[in-house]
Amino acid sequence: MANLNQIQKEVSEILSDQKSMKADIKAILELLGSQNPIKESLETVAAKIVNDLTKLINDCPCNKEILEALGTQPKEQLIEQPKEKGKGLNLGKYSYPNYGVGNEELGSSGNPKALTWPFKAPAGWPNQF
């Protein structure tokens, strides 16, 4: 067990460390407050990064090879354009024998009691719509 003198010594060390940290925090905050706003510094850093990347891309020998290859392309198109334009897909009517549907625009299922939409209430039902 620690005696009172040892505890007092440790507490005083912690107190002095805390005071020095408080002074350090104030100094850091003053330093940060005197600098440029964060947005401006971020913009300058981003501009420098963009400039460096464009310089690397422009100086790359592979980029020059690509530009030369693109410059020597044949003037004729190698891929033929389709001759028929504006013709969509030829989709037939719904013909799967599903006896749970019966809309005319989808094709009839052949079931005379099939459900249709909008739903028509049978005779005797209250009119909800």
Curated annotation (Swiss-Prot):
Domain of life: Viruses
Cell membrane listed as a keyword: no
Main location: virion
Effect of residue 127 to A: Partial loss of capsid binding
Chain coiled-coil ranges: 1-31, 38-59
Ranges for region Capsid binding: 122-129
Any Pfam family the entry gives: Cauli_DNA-bind
GO molecular function, one term: DNA binding
Keywords: Coiled coil, Disulfide bond, Host cell junction, Virion
GO cellular component terms given for this protein: host cell plasmodesma; virion component
Record's subcellular location: Virion; Host cell junction, Host plasmodesma
Presence of keyword Coiled coil: yes
Family: Belongs to the caulimovirus ORF III family.
Known role: Plays a role in virus cell-to-cell and plant-to-plant transmission. Interacts with virion icosahedral capsid and movement protein, thereby facilitating virion cell-to-cell transmission through plasmodesmata opened by viral movement protein. Also interacts with aphid transmission factor, attaching the virion to aphid stylet when the animal feeds on an virus infected plant. Aphid saliva may later detach the virion, inducing release of infectious particles when the animal feeds on a new plant.
Name assigned to this protein: Virion-associated protein
Organism expressing this protein natively: Cauliflower mosaic virus (strain Strasbourg) (CaMV)
